Amino acid sequence: MRTYWLFLLLGGVVSAESLLSPNKRSKEASMDEWTDQQKGIAMGHMLNNIGDSGMHAKDINPGCIIASPSTDSPDYYYQWVRDSALTIMTILDRFFEGDKGLEPIIVKYMDEMVRLQKVPNPSGDFYAGGLGEPKFNVDGTSYDGDWGRPQNDSPALRAIAFIKYMNYLFENGKEVHEVTVWIEAVLADLDYTANHWTEASFDLWEEIKDVHYFTLAVQKRAMQDGTAFAKRIGAPDQAALYQRTIEPIDLKLGEFWDPGMGVIKGYKGRVDRSGLDCSTLLASLYSNEFDMHILPTLLKLQETMTRDYPVNQGWKQAMGRYPEDVYDGVSKSIGNPWFICTSSAAEIIYKAIAYYDNKGLPELTEYNIHFFMKFAEFGDPYNWSVIRKNMHTYADNFLKAVAEFQHPNGSMSEQFSRDDGHQKGARDLTWSYSSLLNAIYRREAIKGSV
């Protein structure tokens, strides 16, 4: 399988030009063909950022997942707990689908995370505060510079990733006593989450210290997954703790719905921001539930960014983090579209299609009618087959933007210019590849369904 990834990195790439040219699309390359090729290309680029065998990750700790090989302007050559967990979850999904050659990477990642938990750092140590530390050096030592600390989504996401793999192990005959070190790590992260979820921490963009929608959403999932996990390993006290934490988190999440704007806000009480933020899309993707309010939120984001970004001409739907963004990838000037956000917008729609395929269309309300009417024909918002087809096209347009602005070899940085689409910021961002793969496989999962 790794040979296949390397082959795709060296050649055989469906070009964005052939994909996007209306006259060539049907003859030379379809979206299906491009996404099929990107499975190997994006996976290859992503694995290049994982130590100690990746092309960009030589001579670093085994299992260390670097955010990017960029060491200057900007310097992202660190391992973030969040980014690493999200990356390994993408790898776990491929492993569960049969790519067993990925298992050594998963094991090395988990062992590296166990080590990092015990490293004293500016946030504290294993017993007091240290699990909220957001990033570490690639040799596994503490990063002691100034940073946005703590980031309390990190231990929750790490616990979710660990539980995914350990549930697989238990289902395939592994005994609890064989993985006690990993169990200790999971319970530590879950206990931290249960005891600190009410506290302000920095958001996933590392800019605002507050209570955030994304952080709460992944903390809720950690408590849900953790409840079942604790019961499975025979830890009833922890199971009870996690169980009783779920409802208050859920109630807090409800406070982020703004009926006046008709959107879920990423944060509240900021006079300098509307609260419209791509982080809410990511929260929906990494949670266990599907909140129907996420669709009008996505539409509002897309319409705002289509208006604000000159690069969004015609069908293009490049997505950035939030309308007021000023981070240009290196310094502060003006924000740009991000590959993470653009791919995740597509994935949200594919997830919604799968949900409505199973559940049927919801009751129309003043909040969702605009979304469904956008995809209806002849004013009929109840014809699911028509709405589904048009939603799928809408989702594919996000991926077409990714195809146009990635490099010919499939490489993706963090951002691309809002003006001309040239890539900006940290090169070969691991999360960019992870988010694209997630969208592609979510798209594949709804093929053939009605």
Curated annotation (Swiss-Prot):
Belongs to the glycosyl hydrolase 15 family. Glycans are attached at residues 383, 409. GO terms for molecular function: glucan 1,4-alpha-glucosidase activity; hydrolase activity, hydrolyzing O-glycosyl compounds. Its EC number is 3.2.1.3. SUPFAM superfamilies: Six-hairpin glycosidases. It catalyses: Hydrolysis of terminal (1->4)-linked alpha-D-glucose residues successively from non-reducing ends of the chains with release of beta-D-glucose. PANTHER family: GLUCOAMYLASE, INTRACELLULAR SPORULATION-SPECIFIC (PTHR31616:SF9), TREHALASE (PTHR31616). The lineage of its organism: Eukaryota, Fungi, Dikarya, Ascomycota, Taphrinomycotina. Substrate binds at residue 147. GO terms for cellular component: cell surface; endoplasmic reticulum; fungal-type vacuole; Golgi apparatus; prospore membrane. Keywords: Carbohydrate metabolism, Glycoprotein, Glycosidase, Hydrolase, Meiosis, Polysaccharide degradation, Signal. The gene is meu17. The active site is at 203 (proton acceptor), 206 (proton donor). The keyword RNA-binding does not apply. Transmembrane segments: none annotated. This is Probable glucoamylase. Residues 17-28 form a propeptide. GO terms for biological process: glycogen catabolic process; meiotic cell cycle. Residues 1-16 form the signal peptide.
